[in-house]
Amino acid sequence: MIKSAVHPLLASLPPTYYSIPLKNPPSRSFNRFFCHSSSSSSSSSSSKNNNVKKSVQDPYFPPRFSVAPMMDWTDNHYRTLARLISKHAWLYTEMVVAETIVHKQDNLDRFLSFPREQHPIALQIGGSNLNNLSKAAALANSYNYDAINLNCGCPSGKVAGHGCFGARLMLNPKFVAEAMSAIAENCDAPVSVKCRIGVDDHDSYSELCDFVYKVASGSPTRHFIVHARKALLNGISPAANRKIPPLKYEYFFGLLRDFPSLQFTMNGGVTCINEVDAAIQCGAHGVMVGRAAYNK
């Protein structure tokens, strides 16, 4: 899909929206990608108890290939299997709600521990309460995740509806910037945002740029994982939200051009390694695969 479509998309990019420097842009080349080889140790004890050295180096480069955080899929068992298959792919946890971390401090290992062999691994958290997001990041810090990601893309009714977080956070970029600042202040790992290209009728390229600009200029966030579909918050299922909204890769490649000091990982509709390679060749800093990582 991507291999045949991505070059025409590049030729039809939207007009430049924000080609302005961000506050304190990182001074590093994006031609290089960080690649970490997992530990050869056979120990299965948690990273909290073993003071595992982090796989992320300074400066931080986004992973070239990663497996998306997926509820009911990317648990410890799946990640163990995935790590046996690939030593270099970045793995993500299922989303863990900030309140769960804060209110389950007597049983944090259940939600946050992982075998050291799973490095490099990122924790995805969700929430809309600044205080709880701060506390959750601080509590997770001792588990030595390689990155922490904020969920701004989940469209499910339970998350974006009653929970008022996930994709709904895209409607409030000021809050997202504050949340990312709070998370970054309470952890040692790099931080990132996973988002859609829009929400409901707020789906123009200029609105997407406004979100990215406000979050990046108001927080330490320099890495965005962009699912190239908008989210529909009209009650349809998460599965339908992965199929009904059309993919708009031109939005993703527009961000690459208009925000040269930021890092962008492409997500959505990627089904094979040839499509991953095509996206990288066309400038994507990284590619995240979701359903294809368990369907094939």
PLM regions and their residue ranges:
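N-terminal chloroplast transit peptides
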Residues: 1-23
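Flavin-dependent oxidoreductase catalytic cores
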Residues: 9, 13, 30-38, 46-296
